[in-house]
Structure formats: C-alpha cells, structure tokens
C-alpha cells in the first residue's frame, strides 16, 4: 500500500535530480549485452561539439531521441542510445586561440601546437562535464557506458583504417584543386563553414584590347577595338586566362575564337563561348580567372585553360604566379607571359585592387564605376573573407561512393522523414563533387600519410607499420603529413566507429545498422550523406553486403526565436536549457550572455533583447515542462519558433497532472480492489466511458509516435488528460466518492481512477519522465504485480478494442451536451449555482430515460438540480422555461422566481452582438474570390464554422425573446 502522499505543490526541482540518479545508479539506461533475447533498437546521438554547452536546438533533438528510446524500451526492445562528443577541429582551435593567446597573431607562428593540444584536452574535460550535466538534467536516458569522443584511441583507429582502405582502393587522392581558403586560419574550410553576406561595393568596367581591329565586321561601330568587362574583383585581372561570351549573343558571336590582351600585363587570352554566360548581366562578357573563382574554375577545366594563382596563402600578390594546367599539374609552357608587374608584388589584395584601378585610369581603360550589391563569402567563425584558392589537398572520389548511397534511398532501405527531403538529398548526391578532407590546422586526426625525401607517399596506421610493410631501411627518413582530416571525416564514421569498428565486436553485430538518426536539415549533405556513403563502403554484413548506417532519417528544422531569428549565442537569443529548468534572474542572465559575447559588436542589441524578452528573468519550469514544450513544437521538418509563453501553458499541464494525481491517491489509497474487472456491468457509465476514451487515446498516441508526429502526441495527451480525464471524469466521480453508499460502485470507481491514472503515467512517460516516475512510485504497488521498480521498464499501454464501449461514448456525449446547455443558460441568465434548478424532458427515448435515471445522482450534484422529471405536454402551465432540443429528447429548463431579467437581457444582447461580429468577419473572408478559389479545404471549414455561428445565433435569439417576454 501507499505510505506517503505526494507533495502538496508540484516543484520539479525537488524531484528531478534524485530520480535521474536513481535511474543511472540502477543501470536502467544500459542495454543487455549478455542475455540478448529481445529485439534491439539503437540511436546514435549526433555528438555535440566540445566548443560549448548544449543549446535549445540540442535539447529539442535529444528530447525527440529520448522519447523514441523510452517508448521502444517500454515496448520490450533492448535499447542502446549511445552518446559522445565531437572534437570540432577548426571551431575548437579558434576557441583555444581566442581564450588563451594573442588574437592578432597566428597561433601556428608563435606557439608550439603540442602545448596547445594539452589546453584543448583540459577544455574538453570541462566541456564534457557540463554537457553531460545538461543531458542528465534534461532527463535523457543515454547509455553512459557507451559514450565516445571523436579523438578517442578507438575512434582514431577507425579513422585511420577508413583512410587506409579508401586510399588502397584508389578512392583517396592528393591533388591541386580550388577550395575555400581562410587566409587568417591558413586552412581550407568546408562549405558548411562559409556564410554569404550581402555587401554594398563597386563594380568596375574595364576595357580589354582586341588583338586586331574588328570594326568592319557586322557593322560594328568605328574604333570598337576592345571588349568591356564588368568586374567586382579587378585585382584578379592578373590571373585572367580567357573572356567568355554566350554563343547566342549577337553582339559578340563574331569574336568567338578571337583574342584580347589583358590590361596591364598584356597577355594574349582567347574569347570563348559558353551558355553559362548571362547575356543580360553586366556587359555580357565575363573574365575567366579559374584559380580564384569557383564558376570560372569549372569553365577552366571544361576548356582546358591554364590556371594562374596570383595570391599567397595570406592573400598577398605573389612575385611569381603559380601556373597549373586544368588537372592541377605544373604548367609546362614558358612562364614569361605570366609575369606579374613588380609594382604589385607582395601587396595585400585590397592594396592591389587600388593599384590596379589607378593603372587602369592611367591607361584610360577604366570605362565606368558603379555601386553594386554583391555577395561575399565569409568564414562564419572568424569573419574572414574566403578566397577561392588552388592548393594541394587530399580528396575523396565521391561519385563512386554516391551510387550506393543514392540506391539505398531510392530503394527505400533508408527513408527520410518527412519525405520531401528525399528529393533534396538525391539532387545533391547526383551533382556531388569530390570531397576535400584535409585541413591545415593542428587540432584533429593527423592524416595517416608519411613521405620520404623523394616525396613518395606511404599510408599506414603508424610509421612502424609502414617501415615493416614496405621493408624500409632505418636510413630512410619518413615525415608525417602535417595536415589533419576534416572533422566531418571522423563524424561520417560515427554510427559504426562508436560501436567498435573495425573490430567485429558484439555491439556492432547487435546494434548496426542503427534504427534512426535525428538531424537538422542544414547538415544533410555534410553529415547524413557522407555517413551513408562511408558506411556502405566500409561496413559489410555477414553476407558481405553493404550495411546502411540507419534505417530512417528524421529531419528537424532550425530553432528560432519568436521573431523568426535563428537562435545563436552571438545574437543573445540563444538559451541554455538549464536556465529554463532551474530558472535564472535577469541580472544573472544578462551577465552570462555578455560574458559569452564579450568580443561581440552587438552588446547593445543583446542587452536590449534580454531587457525586453526577459524583464523578470526566467522562472524555473523543470525538465518535463521544457520537454513537453519542445515536443509540442516538433512539427515535422518545420523550423521551431520558440516562445517562452508556451512554457507556461505546459507547466500548467504538468501542475494539472500533479494535482489530479493527488486527488486520485487521496481517494484510492489503502483500499482493496477485489472485483471482477471483466464484468462491465459493475462499472458505471462514466467508468466505461473513460476506459473507452483511454484506449482510443492509446491508439491515437501510438500511431502518432509511430508516424513521428511528436507534436500530435502532445495534443492527444493534453486533450485526454486535461479535458476528458480531469474536466469530465473526475467531476463524474466526485458525487460517487463523496456521497455514494453503494460499496461496489465505490470500489469500481476507485479502481477505474487508479488504473486510468497509472495508464496515463505510462502513456506520458516518454515525454515527461520525471513527474510520471515520481507519481508512479506512489501508486505502482496497487496496480502492478511485477518486480520492476521503475516506470521506464513497465510495458507501454496497449490498445485493446475490447475496452471500446461505443454506447457509453455516445451516452456521455449526450450528458456532456446536456451539461453544456444548462451551464450556458446559467451563464447567459446570471442564475447563480446557489439556486437549484428544476429541469424536465419531453419526447424522450427509453434509452435516454435509462441513461438519465442511471446517472440521476451525478447529474443533480454536478448541475445543482432540484428535480429531474419526464414531462407530458400538459405538465407545464406557464411560459417561464427554456425549451432546448437535444438528441432523442427536448430539454425543459424552468426559470426560477429569483431571476434578474435586466441582467439576463444585457448578457444576451452582448452575446448576440459578439456572434454577429464573428459572422460578419467570416462572411467577409469567405466572400473574397481568391480565398474561395485557392483554399477549398479552408473554405469548407469556414462554411462549417459559419453554420455553427448561425445556429448559435438562432438559439440565443430564441432564448432572448423568452426572457424578454417574461
């Protein structure tokens, strides 16, 4: 029996941490590796970066994962939810530089990377501790015995093995290609780290001299011996190799195949044609600089043009340009024609631009200058303008790998949720380019490549293995490649490397492929696609068939604030989940945000945001409220617009569940339930009804969860718990609990109360685990006989059609309508609940008579009725009554003598005026032609709403005239 009741006030702070400690110490989160007789279920948590703590976006995705693993665990699956951390190469290196060293100087030039790596590991330990704390406070049931860091030795082994296998099979190569180059970090970066910002600048119109005068051709104007090029980057003139025009442009078709001379350097370059040139943009002539523009690079490779790199890695002009052919190999021809005038040597690109413009003016070939809006590529971490740069890098050949990855999705071995992301994925995969996997930084996985003095490449796990394998003498010196691998390389191996690959161990056999991955749409290409490619190439099943990394991909939107702005620390609108769970004062919140953004240029806007959005700080809501709110916002694939006010609503829901549980415990504690539960006759109408609604709810909830409509699950729970269980069923039980002397009725009602609550707790547990565990611990001894001491290991409620009693559902619906009509009359007429009413029924079916008679006691108590009578036509002798048609009967509500006619007329007028206004607005909306034509579904719903309004209006008018004529 229950020993203690639950606390009077719901205070999540008093229960959540102790409950999590109980779960963790009891090893409830850990899978069964030894006695594996269950079906396995596995999710790999996308590893958060060690650069900082979790934000609401992490909390959202992890909550979705936790709901799934708790649901599957309760459905009897052997669950592994593995977690971990990502070393986040570039992001972490920038953080360490910012925190520990002079921001103006490159860390590589002034400090020993080995000493800095120690600092990174210290940071990692600190970050890991805080992130794990956040995960625990959110209630996430991860396997703490199966957590990994992407720089752990076992992960490092997998990374090396993957590289070696790909290289051995000619899928990794080293070559000179165009990449995003950060001149501050001195490294290539991925497209994901590049943002594009609009900037107001200039566009310069510069003349290129034609090789010979063509003014006599096609009636060209006299002296038209040049082409005018519009460019936003005049400094790259030094690297021009061609001029491109559209073959369908009549202005220039006669010049295709001819030549021009580049300004200042006077190099002879061809005029080529390609349909990529926009006839209507600029002058219709495009300068081609393959070494410093991605579009030009494609054209350069297509037409086998030389590539002239004019910049050093620091974006200063080289004294001697680096010339390559379209394959990235050194250009054989004489370099004399590719000289760079001395006046530009070693100039910063901005100074070189000024100098070029000055020279063009001096040579009188600068035709015009106009203001121009252009898009500038920026490293979103450093703010550095990115330069397309030809550099020697390591690449993976992706087209071969992509074929299997495409087939896995088209054949539905892997399914996207929602489905529309399938086409986005396939479009990108069909246009995939080779993947640059090398980075010129010190933090990350060193590329497992060594060179001898002749630059011969050796690939292996370590130098010792290489020497043994290649039988190299000790005299031969080897040096390891200084580059590290792109962070996404190790991340792409995550599902299997964290399960022990390349060793074919137990975890890998049991839990791979994993069941589902939860990810944001912004990294489909950078992570999801690469995981599929790498897994299918490297991991085989027992029949040597390619394994997929996961069976389903659930894509989430971005976390935005209520104004639609993406949440981020730099904007000051990012929220630490702990601040919602525990609460935080405005003063502390402001201090925290300013500390995290001490170098930001947006200090004033951050202060303004905090002052307006959190004038009183954030009150403590607890993890369950946060989880419930996040789940309610999980509309499939849509961005999440966070609004603090929604928390209040769901906190009230948790409070409601707590209070109704107190009520149930109070009325069911220390009672015996020795009854035949299969005998429906011993249960009241309301008992049979709530049991039916419970099983309908279980069915809908399970279906929504299986369809990954997490937002629907919250709506389903809210509707049942708040409206059906609390608002209706609890009210139906009170007359029985407080006034009934029927022992069997009391027992059956108490039994239905406690068993319904227990089912509600199990149903809700995956979303709100703490409050459900706490309450369940207080009641489980009454309703469970198994020896599992936690709700998380109880079975999830199962839908059983045998419990659906359609007649009871129909009868309670009739009673609810009856109650609503009588309460409405009290509201409109101002008749106090202290005044008991007399009601009667005309033309009533026998079934309804039985229903009323069976529930007579309940109805009189709930509605404060004095009498309920079944009437004949001659039973009414005056006009002091309202007659309201309801199903299978007519309701008569007698108007008592104590009645304020004036107040009633005023209220009726007010309600009639309001309903007329609603009708007017809706009719205006529906009379809009575009609305009726374009939104047929909405129009139909509006028509239904209008019919309801008119019906309500007629009822009000009828009742109004009855009162008026009294």
UniProtKB/Swiss-Prot annotation:
<feature type="coiled-coil region">
    <location>
        <begin position="939"/>
        <end position="960"/>
    </location>
</feature>
<feature type="short sequence motif" description="'HIGH' region">
    <location>
        <begin position="48"/>
        <end position="58"/>
    </location>
</feature>
<dbReference type="Pfam" id="PF00133">
    <property type="entry name" value="tRNA-synt_1"/>
</dbReference>
<dbReference type="GO" id="GO:0005829">
    <property type="term" value="C:cytosol"/>
</dbReference>
<dbReference type="InterPro" id="IPR009008">
    <property type="entry name" value="Val/Leu/Ile-tRNA-synth_edit"/>
</dbReference>
<keyword id="KW-0067">ATP-binding</keyword>
<dbReference type="GO" id="GO:0006438">
    <property type="term" value="P:valyl-tRNA aminoacylation"/>
</dbReference>
<keyword id="KW-0547">Nucleotide-binding</keyword>
<protein>
    <recommendedName>
        <fullName>Valine--tRNA ligase</fullName>
        <ecNumber>6.1.1.9</ecNumber>
    </recommendedName>
</protein>
<feature type="short sequence motif" description="'KMSKS' region">
    <location>
        <begin position="566"/>
        <end position="570"/>
    </location>
</feature>
<dbReference type="GO" id="GO:0002161">
    <property type="term" value="F:aminoacyl-tRNA deacylase activity"/>
</dbReference>
<keyword id="KW-0030">Aminoacyl-tRNA synthetase</keyword>
<dbReference type="InterPro" id="IPR013155">
    <property type="entry name" value="M/V/L/I-tRNA-synth_anticd-bd"/>
</dbReference>
<keyword id="KW-0963">Cytoplasm</keyword>
<keyword id="KW-0648">Protein biosynthesis</keyword>
<dbReference type="InterPro" id="IPR002300">
    <property type="entry name" value="aa-tRNA-synth_Ia"/>
</dbReference>
<dbReference type="GO" id="GO:0005524">
    <property type="term" value="F:ATP binding"/>
</dbReference>
<keyword id="KW-0436">Ligase</keyword>
<comment type="subunit">
    <text>Monomer.</text>
</comment>
<dbReference type="InterPro" id="IPR009080">
    <property type="entry name" value="tRNAsynth_Ia_anticodon-bd"/>
</dbReference>
<keyword id="KW-0175">Coiled coil</keyword>
<dbReference type="GO" id="GO:0004832">
    <property type="term" value="F:valine-tRNA ligase activity"/>
</dbReference>
<dbReference type="InterPro" id="IPR014729">
    <property type="entry name" value="Rossmann-like_a/b/a_fold"/>
</dbReference>
<dbReference type="InterPro" id="IPR033705">
    <property type="entry name" value="Anticodon_Ia_Val"/>
</dbReference>
<dbReference type="InterPro" id="IPR001412">
    <property type="entry name" value="aa-tRNA-synth_I_CS"/>
</dbReference>
<feature type="binding site">
    <location>
        <position position="569"/>
    </location>
    <ligand>
        <name>ATP</name>
    </ligand>
</feature>
<comment type="function">
    <text>Catalyzes the attachment of valine to tRNA(Val). As ValRS can inadvertently accommodate and process structurally similar amino acids such as threonine, to avoid such errors, it has a 'posttransfer' editing activity that hydrolyzes mischarged Thr-tRNA(Val) in a tRNA-dependent manner.</text>
</comment>
<dbReference type="InterPro" id="IPR002303">
    <property type="entry name" value="Valyl-tRNA_ligase"/>
</dbReference>
<dbReference type="Pfam" id="PF08264">
    <property type="entry name" value="Anticodon_1"/>
</dbReference>
<comment type="similarity">
    <text>Belongs to the class-I aminoacyl-tRNA synthetase family. ValS type 1 subfamily.</text>
</comment>
<feature type="coiled-coil region">
    <location>
        <begin position="348"/>
        <end position="368"/>
    </location>
</feature>
